């Protein structure tokens, strides 16, 4: 589950998308110009807000936050500290949302089923982690001793890095000798040229209509084999139909040139750390079914798991931090605007599946592997080796034996856990040998498309959705505000959820101060 963006006023219709995806700043090179387009111009301001806190209010103001994920917890902390009375309502039996860690306390190991890594430039997340006492350790993204198993060929990563042609993709002569990432970066030259010549907004207006595949094939002119190479080796094959901008974000944040950390002991320790600084009610097992607005406030009606009747909570404002799809299961009275409902319905959510296999030993260490990933064009796709061990169990091996997205993930939805275990083992045997089969002791599977609280893994825009829906997803409607990773960029990251929460909390606080008569002019939504 990073972008850096400036406040965009609701009146700035022309900025509809500059929203964050492309919001420009001059830089010293073409590459830096494109990088600048991917950053929030208000990032420093957001970081300053969490460090300094929001201006304190003078009157009692009750805010109900729907959802106890990272966005909800972040907003709760800011609003609580500013003097608001906060209540969090969460449908699940736990906090954290898509930060979920499976823990086998009996055997002394854990596995992150959702968010698992933090890029080095996610300063807002890292500030909270430090403040909350959450420890981080390096997440090893790349290990040269891992493997590629594609086109029926098994090769060590270091041999592929030395000679990409060894994988036998039938690329054109002009494409030979280039890695998948080099091919992709070269293909972006027309986007970079557009940014340098006309700015970020012009580039967005011109290229938001393209899917990744359409751009790479029709504009950049890559061969079909180069496309297949990029899809296989950058884990983008199943994402070729999504917006070009999403692929640019993805490769900017998930690549071997970015440094990462992970939460020591499991990512769920991060949301759990908020409990030590929050003094607000958190109502678990409480599913919001209706949000009713009036001139005097809002009424949030939720159903507790053990009760048939609804319970009403009266508040001054509500902040909805669920996924866009989960929000569709709530009744809003009066109805949300047509544009808001269209955005919630239409925004594309990706699928993601993780298959965790446990072993009686860490067999990959015999191959000289610590951390990193092996890549295959078989159903497992990406295999991640752990960057940590377990103090309570020095022998157990816990492997993310398959990490898939989009259509690669959808392929796995109908299979049982046991079937997925056998599928992942078959692929591992082809890479590490038959010996691993006898070492396997168990399986844990997480299919985010089947999660009854998120209804998907994370937002991932298709062509035109940046221009059509990005601003609308964040926009408040009266006393009802919205936040979550789907309302910020880049999608899927914990910090993006936090950035949206800071913006929403700031807007709620400004609206409260306005009602106190401290400001003369209405404060529009800031994104």
From Swiss-Prot:
Entry keyword set: Antibiotic, Antimicrobial, Disulfide bond, FAD, Flavoprotein, Glycoprotein, Immunity, Innate immunity, Oxidoreductase, Secreted, Signal
SUPFAM superfamilies in UniProt: FAD-linked reductases, C-terminal domain (SSF54373), FAD/NAD(P)-binding domain (SSF51905)
Tissue specificity of this protein: Expression mainly observed in plasma, spleen, kidney and gills with low levels detected in blood and no expression detected in brain, liver, heart, muscle or intestine (at protein level).
Major localisation: secreted
Cellular compartment(s): Secreted
Presence of keyword Flavoprotein: yes
BP GO terms, sorted: amino acid catabolic process; defense response to bacterium; innate immune response
Role played: Inhibits the growth of both Gram-negative and Gram-positive bacteria. Displays strong antibacterial activity towards V.cholerae and E.tarda. Causes deformation of the surface of S.aureus and the formation of pores on the surface of E.coli. Strong antiparasitic activity is seen towards C.irritans, T.brucei and I.multifiliis. Cilia of treated theronts are lost and the macronucleus swells, inducing cell membrane rupture and efflux of the cytoplasm.
Record family assignment: Belongs to the flavin monoamine oxidase family. FIG1 subfamily.
Protein name as annotated: L-amino-acid oxidase
Organism: Siganus canaliculatus (White-spotted spinefoot)
